[in-house]
Structure formats: C-alpha cells, structure tokens
C-alpha cells in the first residue's frame, strides 16, 4: 500500500507573509506547484497560499504587486504524516475540499502533498483492488 511519503513533494516553494501575490505566484510557477508554504517566526505555524487564493484575489480586481500573501493565506490546515496510507490523505483532502496537505514528522514540516501528487503516483485504484482480493 502506498504511503504519503511515496507521493509527497519537497518544500521548494516557500514565501513569507510580506511577499506580494506576484512573488508567490512566480515562486509557484518556478517550482511547478499549486501552492507555496508560508513561513514566518511571527506565525503560530506554517500556512499555505494556493492557486485558488491567487485566483480569488485576481477575480476581485486586487493588485498582485501590492497585496501581501499574509492577507490571503490559509492558516487552518489539514496535515498528514509520512507513514499514513496515501488513500487516507486523499480521503481527507476530498472530505475537506482541499488540494494540499502539509506533511509533518512529529513537529517537523517535511513536505507537502497535493492532489496532483496523489494522481502522479497513481495506484489508489490498484491499491483498492489489491485490498479487495
């Protein structure tokens, strides 16, 4: 059975809350990801800014060169552990209507898992068939 660690991505796209939305989008494009992790010593924990957050700001006519990530990021996150079954993490994503979860090993942030990662490694349907056999 595949685990979260088999599909998760490294923490490449990282920004701070004072980065602009344009800077966040450039970082996400550079790393070919749909989300950037937001880190800052003043935050209680890591947050995320996603493609959806950027699209909402654009649709509202906001200036991506003036708007700060901190005003658009998501702070209440669903998290996973590297050893979780991939199916469990995917189920949580569907249940909560999200496409990204942060992966923690104990207190340490070790990666990010996206629905794109789940699809990339595939095998969920194959895992379900194997479990049923």
Language model: regions and residue ranges:
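Conserved beta-strand segments that form the floor/walls of ligand-binding pockets within enzyme
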Residues: 37, 102, 114
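The conserved cystathionine-beta-synthase
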Residues: 15-32, 38-39, 80-97, 104, ...
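Acidic/polar N-terminal loop/beta-strand segments that form early-domain functional surfaces
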Residues: 39-41, 51-52
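Tandem CBS (Bateman) regulatory domains
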Residues: 1-11, 46-79, 85-94, 109, ...
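Glycine-biased flexible loop/turn sites that connect beta-strands or occur in inter-domain linkers
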Residues: 42-43, 107
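Local beta-strand N-terminus motif with an aromatic residue
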Residues: 33, 45-46
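Conserved SAM-binding loop
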Residues: 14, 102, 111
